[in-house]
C-alpha cells in the first residue's frame, strides 16, 4: 500500500517552501512497509482539486497527508478541521482571489480529520518536537487542500489529514524581520514520526481496497 504526501510550491513572498522540501525528502521512503509517494501541488485554486482527486483515485493510499507552511507559527501544528470556505486577501500564484465562496457547493460546512491529532501532538512533544493542536487551517490553499483530501479519503475509507509546519531556519535567517522557524531536519523527523504513529494507530474498522 501507499502513503500519499502532498506539499506546496513557493508562493507570495516565500521563495522556498519547507512543505515542498519535506515531501521531496520523504518521497520514495518506506514507513512501516508502506511506500511514500510525494506530490508537489501548485499554489493555484483552479488546479489543486483535480490533482488531489486524481492522485487519490489512482493510488488509493492507506493515508493521505497534506503538508503546508504557516509563516508565523513556531511549532508543528496538526489540523483538526477543514472548512468549506475560500477567502484570500492575497491572490494565489495565478492571481486568483476568493471572497467567501465554497470549496464544494454540495459539501459539508466543515470536515474533521479521522487522524488522532490530539494524541499525535502529545507524541511529537514527547519526542522533543514542538507541536500543538490547530483548530484552523485558514482559508487559503492549505485549508482548500485539506478539505479535498479528507473528502476524498472518506470515499475510500482511508485516512486523511493535514499538518502545518513553520518556516525552515535557513530561509527564516534570510528574511529581514523576526519570524519563528524550525530546522528542516526536525520537521522531516516530525512528519516521519507522524506517519509512523498514524499508521500504527489506524482505526481497526477501516478497510482498504
UniProtKB/Swiss-Prot annotation:
The encoding gene: pcp2
What are its GO biological-process terms?
A: proteolysis
Q: Which UniProt keywords apply?
A: Cytoplasm, Hydrolase, Protease, Thiol protease
Entry EC number(s) = 3.4.19.3
Q: How does it assemble?
A: Homotetramer.
Q: What is the lineage of its organism?
A: Archaea, Thermoproteota, Thermoprotei, Sulfolobales, Sulfolobaceae
Pfam families xref list: Peptidase_C15
Can you provide one Gene Ontology molecular function annotated for this UniProt record?
A: pyroglutamyl-peptidase activity
State the similarity comment: Belongs to the peptidase C15 family.
What's the protein here called?
Pyrrolidone-carboxylate peptidase 2
**Catalytic residue positions:** 79, 142, 164
Name the InterPro entries for this protein: Peptidase_C15, Peptidase_C15-like, Peptidase_C15-like_sf, PGP-I_bact-type, PGPEP1_Cys_AS, PGPEP1_Glu_AS
Keyword Protease annotated: yes
* SUPFAM superfamilies given in the database record: Pyrrolidone carboxyl peptidase (pyroglutamate aminopeptidase)
GO CC annotation, single? cytosol
> What HAMAP family does the annotation carry?
Pyrrolid_peptidase (MF_00417)
Catalytic activity annotation:
Release of an N-terminal pyroglutamyl group from a polypeptide, the second amino acid generally not being Pro
**Localization annotation:** Cytoplasm
| PROSITE patterns documented for this protein | PYRASE_CYS (PS01334), PYRASE_GLU (PS01333)
